Regions:
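Class I S-adenosyl-L-methionine-dependent methyltransferase catalytic core
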Residues: 1-281
């Protein structure tokens, strides 16, 4: 089992709920994921997971649009078996055999082995490629060979730090966007200062690149503080940035984000305020 412990938490709910619906809308032939981690995880019922997937499943049960979501359908079935599906498994289940190619990057070999095993189980091995490599370099090198119909899922946590390739993950999104590809980027932050810095970095970088058509939304715990950490459920806020996607996908990103704020309005993380607020980029 891989060493990854960040799964089934509240930011994963945002990321994975939206990923599933956007993939269903966009139906790409090629799916690339920069930081795959595992396809499937055994649940451990930590406080962070209680605040994440368990809270979502309980509350979504009462909200028809969330209960009808692909994410709810896939995770509720797997959670009954004691497992959580990560983004590689969700993407493979949503796209299935209609996708010609899945490309997964990660630095954890055991995580990629997990992805490969899961692909075999659902009979998609023939279309799955795994790359044990730095994905900022690997993805940048891959982009010129991909058709514009490709979908790039960028999920590194830190989007403003340059890797060995000399580029950041926001640079990867910008390059792919300028080539006409559909992109979904997720990022996280733990303080208000982090959030403000990232917001400025994202908007100024997109403006410099001439990218005006994008959808950005952030969900942040009301427990966040300017430059300190009051509580730590993994991270205190996260954002989704989408480019070159359809209007239907843009609408879903905003709609589901607002619905998550609604179902978290009385939430608690341990004894802390677990409610969220939304901000658009």
């Amino acid at each position: 089992m891989a060493t990854y412990t960040h799964f089934a938490k509240q930011p994963d709910v945002l990321k994975h709920l939206i990923l599933c619906e956007v993939l269903k809308n966009e139906t790409p032939q090629i799916y690339v994921e920069t930081n795959s981690a595992c396809a499937i995880y055994p649940m451990t019922q930590t406080p962070e997971q209680q605040y994440g997937i368990y809270h979502f499943l309980e509350k979504a049960d009462e909200v028809p649009s969330l209960k009808d979501s692909i994410y709810y359908q896939l995770e509720s079935g797997e959670m009954a078996k004691g497992n959580y599906l990560g983004s590689p498994a969700l993407a493979m289940n949503v796209l299935g055999k209609q996708a010609k190619r899945f490309v997964f990057f990660d630095l954890e070999k055991s995580a990629l082995e997990n992805v490969g095993t899961y692909a075999k189980q659902i009979e998609l091995s023939a279309s799955v490629e795994i790359h044990h490599a730095d994905s900022s370099r690997g993805t940048i090198e891959l982009l010129p060979s991909l058709p514009t119909s490709s979908f790039i899922h960028i999920d590194p946590y830190e989007i403003d730090k340059k890797g060995d390739s000399g580029v950041t993950y926001l640079d990867v999104l910008i390059q792919a966007t300028l080539l006409g590809m559909k992109c979904l980027l997720w990022y996280g932050f733990i303080t208000g200062d982090d959030k403000a810095s990232l917001d400025n970095y994202i908007t100024s970088s997109l403006e410099k690149a001439g990218i005006k058509d994008y959808t950005g939304v952030e969900l942040t715990m009301n427990s966040i503080r300017k430059d300190s950490v009051l509580c730590n459920p993994g991270i205190l806020g996260s954002g989704i940035l989408a480019t070159n996607v359809s209007q239907a996908s843009k609408d879903i990103i905003l709609d589901y984000s607002n619905q998550l704020v609604d179902i978290y309005k009385d939430a608690k993380y341990k004894d802390y305020d677990g409610s969220l607020y939304i901000q658009h980029l």
